[in-house]
Structure formats: C-alpha cells, structure tokens
Amino acid sequence: MKKGSETKIIKRSQINLNPCNPKVHTDADIKQQKANIKKVGLIGGIQWNETTGNLIDGHKRVMSVDLIQGYDGTPETDYDIKVEAVDFDEKTEKEQLLFMAKSQDPIDYNLVAKNFSIDEIDFKAAGFTKQDTEQIKLLQDD
C-alpha cells in the first residue's frame, strides 16, 4: 500500500460508486450539490482507489456532476474528472470509506452493519468509538 494520493484526470467510466458506501444521499441532497457545482465548479478532492476503481469519498459530487454532464454510462457521455487517486487494498479502502463517511455526515449504522464485518474491519482505525462498534455488533446480531 502506497501512502498519500496523486491528483489525476481520469474518465468517469473508470469510477465505481462504492457499493459499501454507508452514506445515504437523497435526491434533494444531490440537487443542492448540483446547484452548488453549477455556481462555483467542482471543488474538493474526490478520493478514488485506483486498485479497485471504487470511490472512497465524493459520491454525492460525482452523482451531481453526472447529472450536469448527462452521464448515462455510455462512451458517448463519458467525461474527464479530477480525482485524488490512492492505491489501497480492500481492507484499507473500507476503513477509509467508513472514516470519511463518519467524519463528514451522519451515517446509517444499519448499512454499516450490513456491509462491514466486525472481524474484517478495524473499526477503531475507521474512527469508530467502542460504543459505535457495540451498536454495530448489536445490529449484526439481529
């Protein structure tokens, strides 16, 4: 695993919206983000794991730019996007996905319990407290 990130311009088609993303983005959230991007442009680093193609952070921004660009997954609508590329193994990707989600927005603990095994992830490294981890364990036991 290489530490840090490298700024790159890649094709949108290289990005997978992370299926384990524990944040829920409503249509209203995306619409608000889209309006802001149209006003001031795309600001901030979109964190992308080059190893898996998965996003770590920036799902709402990418979904908003998709709407602006009319992206539908076809080569005709593909576009260039600036990302902060990292080279993480799957475990580190998941830990950072959780860390970024927890540090920015309220997260859905049910999604965390569904998508992340207590035995698989170091929840402390992902920014979770002992109480958070106990809550996730309880949800997994249900």
What are these regions (language model features)?
Residues M1-V86, E95-D142:
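Short, charged/polar connector segments at secondary-structure boundaries
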